[in-house]
């Protein structure tokens, strides 16, 4: 198994542990969700991802602890790319916290999601994740490293939600042909 995939899953578990008190508001999306749905199936997807993506549903998000405090307490730090919602675990593996665009307050002129009292830099507003907060199921997520015994129950976006998110992502990147490879 690819070492990068093992590290990315470990970072996902680090984030789920950090955000345990926000458990009901967190949904695994992106490649990690696809891997969880496909398991060991022989499918035509790249079986390596360098990051983990988490959708945050602010409708049931507790005010305490603040997302940024929970992440920092677990050793995460903001990615220097200055993109809101971009975090790195202590090993430098990225985890992105994203809020569905229509669930973020304020105008669309900001990349950082507006979900007071949480920091505007804690999460990023993202078009296309709305379906993930509706189409998801509770799944058991385990480490891929045989020496890591952690297991978490977390919401994972369903196939329809993942497809909708991918279509939006591709549409956003039509003006950036060099970024259409994922």
Model-derived features: positions:
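Compositionally biased terminal segments of proteins
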Residues: 1-182
């Amino acid at each position: 198994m690819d070492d990068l995939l093992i590290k990315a899953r470990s970072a996902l578990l680090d984030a789920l542990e950090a955000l345990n008190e926000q458990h009901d508001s967190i949904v695994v999306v992106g490649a990690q969700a696809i891997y969880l749905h496909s398991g060991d199936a022989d499918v035509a997807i790249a079986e390596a991802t360098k990051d983990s993506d988490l959708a945050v549903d602010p409708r049931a998000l507790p005010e305490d602890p603040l997302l940024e405090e929970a992440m920092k307490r677990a050793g995460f730090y903001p990615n220097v790319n200055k993109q809101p919602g971009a975090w790195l675990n202590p090993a430098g593996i990225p985890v992105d916290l994203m809020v569905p665009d229509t669930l973020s307050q304020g105008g669309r002129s900001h990349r950082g999601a507006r979900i007071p009292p949480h920091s505007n830099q804690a999460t990023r507003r993202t078009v296309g994740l709305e379906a993930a907060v509706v189409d998801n199921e509770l799944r058991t997520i385990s480490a891929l490293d045989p020496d890591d015994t952690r297991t978490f129950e977390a919401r994972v976006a369903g196939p329809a939600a993942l497809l909708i998110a991918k279509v939006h992502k591709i549409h956003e990147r039509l003006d950036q042909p060099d970024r259409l490879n994922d």
